[in-house]
Swiss-Prot record:
Coiled coil: none
A GO CC term attached to the entry: proton-transporting ATP synthase complex
Residues involved in ATP binding: G170, D171, R172, Q173, I174, G175, K176, T177
Protein name, entry field: ATP synthase subunit alpha
Topological category with respect to the lipid bilayer: Peripheral membrane protein
Species per Swiss-Prot/TrEMBL record: Alcanivorax borkumensis (strain ATCC 700651 / DSM 11573 / NCIMB 13689 / SK2)
UniProt lineage: Bacteria, Pseudomonadati, Pseudomonadota, Gammaproteobacteria, Oceanospirillales
Annotated function: Produces ATP from ADP in the presence of a proton gradient across the membrane. The alpha chain is a regulatory subunit.
Length: 514
């Protein structure tokens, strides 16, 4: 047996000691005190920051929302059923981030950016913070480019510009989502990237939206962020912020994006649930005091930013380009009550609203937009020339019709001018009807609006107006394609184009093909 030299033994021990890793990792740990309804109370975590990600045992994450004297209130991001009292929790030193970039287009993800469409992982090259400060006043530009929804009634009377926030408000089941989805479908050739955020909806409804976007070739241009009714309140609360971050990726690089929040009422409900479980003091309708700030900080991130902002953000890589993020938030009212807390909040934050009415919907007028109450505060500057010039007469005709129709119910004999106005208003109301998934081009809108303004519908039976419009558009797209292409190119309207439209309408009316 070999004898070991004591000096050799000491050398081996010394070398082992020299190689020993004695570095220490400071970890701020706490202990779970209670778990209930997705809310966790934690003892410890003295250095945790507001909004910081915290990690539970088993790789589950949470977000610190209440920082109290001797405990922390956190919301669990995901399934909380595996958490138990006494488990360890640690700080991560990070705030919540989601993957962003063009790799997200065409995919359906949850509020944390994880794919849920079964198409495999997303190879996103970067992540961005979910909560961001909106661009300051100095970086913003005026809204001066249009977002065409494809609905003639909206584009003519309530125009939407790139960088605007336009609220879609109304009771349940009257076509709010239909308007927003059609607006997304209409962007498939416009270069505008789209984000659709589904909050608290049935999974079957979300699947139907995905299917319709795929059918119309718009899905490859769209990101869908889904927090369904079966997801925790924390995910429904975070989904709009995650979707906004994904849309901002394009805005900050000199591109245009459109985001639909469907709907913010359910986000407010989720936030109310979280706040009450965190024992925050309730205010009006049991909402917490900062529910206005919840929506204002989200919607202020939709903006049109100037060339300097884009150049600074991209470190000089993109020059001379403006970027925009246009928001279409949806709010669901109860019994048409727009004076409730959340609707009044969002109306005051946005740049206008499209008000959909149950009575109009039930009487067959779709989209069921009330033209008298609906308004766009900044979109007029962004309208195409032809729609702006010809759309003014439509709003006036509908306003006069609504006023006269109320009096006509009580009057037995009407003079000729009043009867003409009533008939014209009826014809225009019928003309403003439009089927879902059938968006119109600028040229098609221009021709239809010109026909309404210049008396081409006069004396026509209301039942035949739909057939007249369909036949007119078929004729214009086949026989007058050069004129339609010229209008679509720039949306201009001048004496020459007016004369060509008039000549085309006269020729069509002579054919009597409807």
């Amino acid at each position: 047996m070999q004898q070991l030299n004591p000096s050799e033994i000491s050398e081996i021990i010394k070398s082992r000691i020299a190689k020993l890793d004695t570095s220490t990792e400071a970890r701020n740990e706490g202990t779970v005190v209670s778990v209930s309804d997705g809310i966790v109370r934690i003892h410890g975590l003295a250095d945790v920051m507001f909004g910081e990600m915290i990690e539970f045992e088993g790789g589950i994450y949470g977000m610190a929302l209440n920082l109290e004297q001797d405990s922390v209130g956190a919301v669990v991001l995901g399934d909380y059923l595996g958490l138990a009292e006494g488990q360890k929790v640690r700080c991560t030193g990070r705030i919540l981030e989601v993957p962003t970039g063009p790799e997200m287009l065409g995919r359906v993800v949850d509020a944390l950016g994880n794919p849920i469409d079964g198409k495999g992982p997303i190879e996103a090259k970067q992540t961005d913070a979910v909560e961001k400060v909106a661009p300051g006043v100095i970086w913003r530009r005026e809204v001066n480019e249009p977002v065409q929804t494809g609905y003639k009634s909206i584009d003519a009377m309530v125009p939407i510009g790139r960088g605007q926030r336009e609220l879609i408000i109304g009771d349940r089941q009257i076509g709010k989502t239909a308007v927003a989805v059609d607006a997304i479908i209409n962007q498939k050739d416009s270069g505008i990237k789209c984000v659709y955020v589904a909050i608290g909806q049935k999974q079957s409804t979300i699947a139907n939206v995905v299917r319709k976007l795929e059918e119309h070739g718009a899905m490859e241009n769209t990101i869908i962020v889904a927090a369904s009714a079966s997801d925790p309140a924390s995910m429904q609360f975070l989904a709009p912020f995650a979707g906004c971050t994904m849309g901002e990726y394009f805005r900050d690089r000199g591109e245009d994006a459109l985001i639909v929040y469907d709907d913010l009422t359910k986000q407010a409900w989720a936030y109310r649930q979280i706040s009450l479980l965190l024992r925050r003091p309730p205010g009006r309708e049991a909402y917490p005091g900062d529910v206005f700030y919840l929506h204002s900080r989200l919607l202020e991130r939709a903006a049109k930013v100037n060339e300097d902002y884009v150049e600074k953000f991209t470190n000089g890589e993109v020059k001379g380009k403006t970027g925009s993020l246009t928001a279409l938030p949806i709010i669901e009212t109860q019994g048409g009550d727009v004076s409730a807390f959340v609707p009044t909040n969002v109306i005051s934050i946005t740049d206008g609203q499209i008000f959909l009415e149950t009575d109009l919907f039930n009487s067959g007028i779709r989209p069921a937009m009330n033209a008298g109450v609906s308004v766009s505060r900044v979109g007029g500057a962004a309208q195409t020339k032809i729609v702006k010039k010809l759309g003014g007469g439509i709003r006036l005709a509908l306003a006069q019709y609504r006023e006269l129709a109320a009096f006509a119910q009580f009057a037995s004999d009407l003079d000729d001018s009043t009867r003409e106005q009533l008939e014209h208003g009826q014809a225009v109301t019928e003309l403003m009807k439009q089927k879902q998934y059938s968006p119109m081009s600028v040229a098609e809108m221009g021709v239809v609006l010109y026909a309404a303004n210049e008396g081409y519908l006069k004396g026509m039976e209301v039942e035949k107006i739909g057939a007249f419009e369909a036949a007119l558009l078929d004729y214009m797209n086949s026989e007058k394609k050069a004129l339609m292409d010229k209008i679509n190119e720039k949306g201009d309207y001048n004496g020459e184009i007016e004369a060509e439209i008039k000549e085309s309408l006269d020729q069509f009316k002579a054919t009597q093909t409807w």
